A protein has these predicted regions:
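Hydrophobic transmembrane alpha-helices and their immediate loop junctions
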Residues: 1-455
Length: 455
């Protein structure tokens, strides 16, 4: 969940702002100067809410309104929605990405409304941004009298412009994400392996013989790894197939037995040895397996991976058998090939290995380049795609207090005037449609919260 220290800092910050605002407003000597300073800068303060409004961008909006106006008449697309809960399905380490991408999506959304309004000869009083507790947002102040005088079709263009601009931003971020390898080609190479950018401390991949930041993973057993997607698919494949075996000369296999005749295959606390099982040629019909305890690193280094004894028949001068680690059903022994060090040997559940490291497809061509730059660009683009697309979808829903409410009202006025001549009946139809849309959206949000928090 969200760290308590973060909540304390946020609450303390808002309390300090509110206390300072209250003291300055109650001061006889500083009240007039303070309120004049706030008004001159377009600032408004209230509990857990800061709002800033300005007219300095009106010229920019006017200029944008004259660029390719036909694009404002197109309609947007769709995106899938998922409830985001910080600390549950949103890592607290990525909150900065979330809020910056959310603010950018909100600014572009309001920019669309402002540009479309100027195209329809509606005056823009100003543009502003706000912070409500921790939620950043933006708004545009339109001249209501002008807005009410234009036709419903013109109003609909203005109300749909925010959704359209969010869709355009979503597509642009998605295109940048796909073209990122081309943009970074002079500085970063791809397709040579998955580069380790972070190792979770205390995880199975941590330690002197584990993975380190800067290592390049090139294979998991006999599954080659060229990208992060290969890493995930190889782990999935290894976890859903039989344990990989290794070709070992028959002469080096010595079955383990106790003095009393019972089998003893490695002690439970052994850190260097592992129990392997195999089938001798004379026991193939009965499928009787024998077990041998062997030093695992020495045994698997330089050996060929196999599935059956037939895989070991070719290419070996001495008779060899395919031996497999004797483990529980879901536990796997995985040999991780990475540069520039030796193999990392992993014993456990494959998902634990996947979550133990952070990887990227981009390998720096020069030593002075930062490993996290491509990761930052990738992560930020993904958040922009998700949040901008989500804003487009949510504001398209006919729901109270969202753009969908005004879009629906304008659409009904533009299409039902000749069919339903009574304005009150049209408003009643719109009310029930808004009620249904709001109920569906609220139900989806509630269901999403339940699914996220119930995991």
């Amino acid at each position: 969940m969200i760290p308590v220290s973060l909540l304390v800092c946020v609450m303390a910050g808002w309390c300090a702002i509110y206390l300072a605002d209250t003291l300055l407003r109650s001061s006889i000597t500083h009240r007039i100067g303070y309120e004049t300073w706030l008004a001159s800068r377009g600032l408004m303060l209230s509990p857990f809410h800061v709002r800033w409004q300005t007219t300095m961008f009106n010229r920019l909006f006017s200029y944008c309104a004259r660029i390719n106006p036909r694009a404002l008449y197109l309609i947007g697309g769709q995106q899938a929605l998922q409830v985001v809960v910080p600390g549950v399905n949103l890592p607290t380490s990525q909150l900065a990405y979330f809020f910056i991408a959310l603010l950018l999506s909100g600014v572009i959304h309001e920019l669309g409304h402002a540009v479309a309004a100027l195209r329809e000869q509606v005056r823009v009083n100003g543009f502003g941004m706000f912070v409500f507790v921790m939620y950043p947002g933006a708004f545009v102040d339109l001249f209501t009298t002008h807005l009410n005088l234009i036709s419903p079709a013109q109003q609909l263009r203005i109300f749909c412009a925010g959704v359209w601009h969010n869709f355009v931003l979503c597509v642009a971020a998605l295109a940048f994400l796909f073209l990122l390898p081309i943009f970074l080609f002079p500085m970063y190479s791809t397709g040579v392996g998955a580069l380790v950018t972070e190792v979770v401390q205390g995880s199975a991949a941590d330690g002197p013989r584990g993975l380190s930041v800067g290592d390049i993973v090139t294979g998991l057993e006999d599954c080659p790894v060229r990208t992060v997607e290969d890493w995930s698919s190889c782990l999935f494949h290894l976890s859903h197939t039989a344990q990989t075996g290794y070709c070992v000369p028959v002469a080096s296999l010595q079955p383990s037995w106790r003095l009393d005749g019972t089998m003893d295959c490695c002690s439970n606390n052994s850190l260097t040895d592992l129990c392997f099982s195999y089938i001798k040629p004379e026991h193939r019909k009965s499928r009787e397996r024998e077990y041998a305890c062997m030093p695992v690193r020495k045994m698997v280094t330089g050996t060929r991976a196999c599935r059956t004894d037939d895989d070991c028949a070719a290419g070996f001068h001495t008779a060899s058998l395919c031996v497999t680690p004797s483990l529980e059903n879901q536990t796997r022994f995985i040999r991780v090939t990475h540069l520039p060090n030796t193999h990392m040997l992993f014993v456990g559940y494959p998902p634990h290995l996947q979550y133990a490291v952070s990887l990227t497809n981009f390998v720096p061509r020069f030593g002075f380049l930062h490993l996290d730059l491509p990761v930052f660009l990738e992560t930020f683009c993904k958040y922009v795609v998700s949040l901008s697309g989500a804003l487009a979808v949510v504001n398209s829903v006919p729901c109270f207090a969202l753009d969908g409410q005004w879009m629906l009202n304008a659409l009904l006025e533009a299409t039902l005037v000749t069919v339903v001549t009574d304005r009150q009946k049209r408003e009643l139809i719109g009310f029930f449609l808004l009620l249904a849309g709001s109920a569906l959206l609220a139900a989806n949000v509630a269901l999403g919260l339940w699914m996220v928090t119930a995991r």
